[in-house]
């Protein structure tokens, strides 16, 4: 293997001591042999940096004063050597064959295609709650997929494998709401650089949801911010494309009344139930949203 088959995994770390070792071990023990792991500690106040340094013979460790997620990612990206990038959360866990499966699929497509997958949801203790199934848009045209993306279709960035050449064209931007950084990146790739997206139906990661992580207030705030980013992107297009996207988006959204009713119900359930059951309700709610797309 050569660097054309090297996968660069970037882990932005901030106060992640509780799950960090489990995350690192899941990456180090991948069946795919050609991986570089780059961890960037963003001024953690716990033992995260100490844990990273214990793995310094297996991973590249960088540290900086607290500057936020975008800065950590950009520092990591500036040091990658691989042909593909995998951005991964220090709370989450890969299956042993995650990267091998992603690379095998990526080789079937051009270097302008982002590969992503379904994922399993786990709780604080690592207990599996259920599989989260992404809507399968593999047969859609790039334009129709972009409409879904502009409508707020979320792709779990932790499942993705991104060609490095796309990240040479796009920017990880510092945003007021860091939760939207990945959505902003995907819009850049899709709308500005005509990237395509391909879904693997198998779950390839364990995505950890923390008790109290999401709330009605936070979900509403993020959704509003996502809509702001979307409108900014459309307004950057030439007049004919602006009109085409706005018209198609409005037409698509007219069919979404069922989805929006489900969303409102889901938010009420999350905000009105005790935190110890919210995770389970959330998984049901998330899948209901996807079923109504």
What are these regions (language model features)?
Residues 1-28:
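N-proximal low-complexity "stem/linker" segments adjacent to membrane-targeting elements
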Residues 18-21, 44-54, 93, 97:
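Acidic helix N-cap motif at the loop->helix transition within catalytic regions
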Residues 26, 41-50, 67, 89:
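A conserved acidic beta->alpha catalytic loop
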Residues 64-80, 101:
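Glycine-rich, basic loop-to-helix element that forms the pyrophosphate-binding segment
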Residues 78, 137-221, 225-226:
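Conserved nucleotide-sugar donor-binding catalytic segment
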Residues 85:
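Short aromatic/hydrophobic "clamp" motif used to bind/position activated sugar donors
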Residues 97-130:
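Conserved donor NDP-sugar-binding/catalytic core segment of glycosyltransferases
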Residues 177, 184, 191, 197, ...:
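C-terminal subregions of glycosyltransferases and related glycan-biosynthesis enzymes
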